[in-house]
A protein has these predicted regions:
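Active-site cofactor/cluster-binding pocket
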Residues: 1-185
């Protein structure tokens, strides 16, 4: 698989930095490929802008910067407004329609999956696992990481008392991703 640039963006408290760490480690540790991770967030602990950048490749990554993401996960309108126009035309955008209302910045993107990540997480019992639902969707939609690798990495990073909830969130993401892809074809 060629270089794949992945941008996860939303607001602090949605767990997207952790999501990026989980994804990068899944690829590097369990799929034995190259991965970089970079994060940034506003000065607020929660509620400010947050982004997580992951680059995946089969060869050494010499330029660890994302310019035009192949994959874009947006969990706020601000994220779409700021980064949507940079997504590659043949890329993939995954948006939470409960949080993103205006998709104009994604007009050039051919594959936009509208999946209620936060609502799915809420139905599972805690919206804090929306990031894990998103990782399930991203796994199915992109093939950039194997299911086994993402499952192991999620379990490496979540508290023991939340393992079952996080497993359910990941499975719900796999299912929602598969359904969105089937509906788009």
């Amino acid at each position: 698989m060629a270089r794949c640039e992945i941008l996860l963006s939303g607001f602090g408290g949605q767990g997207l930095v952790l999501g990026g760490i989980i994804l990068a480690e899944a690829v590097a540790v369990y799929d034995d490929r190259q991965a970089t991770h970079k994060q940034s967030y506003g000065p607020e602990a929660r509620g400010g802008a947050s982004k997580s950048e992951v680059i995946v490749d089969d060869v050494e990554i010499s330029f660890p910067e994302i310019r035009n993401p192949d994959v874009f996960l947006a969990m706020t309108q601000e994220a779409v407004n700021k980064y949507g126009k940079n997504v590659k035309e043949n890329g993939i955008a995954i948006i939470d329609p409960g949080l993103v209302f205006d998709e104009k910045a994604l007009a050039g993107v051919k594959r936009v999956y509208r999946i209620p990540l936060t609502e799915i997480a809420r139905e599972l019992g805690n919206e804090i696992v929306a990031n894990i639902v998103a990782l399930g969707v991203l796994t199915v939609a992109t093939g950039v990481v194997t299911r086994e690798a993402i499952e192991k990495s999620v379990l490496d990073h979540v508290p023991a008392k939340t393992i079952e909830l996080n497993k359910a969130a990941l499975d719900a993401g796999f299912k929602a991703g598969a359904e969105a892809i089937a509906a788009a074809q």
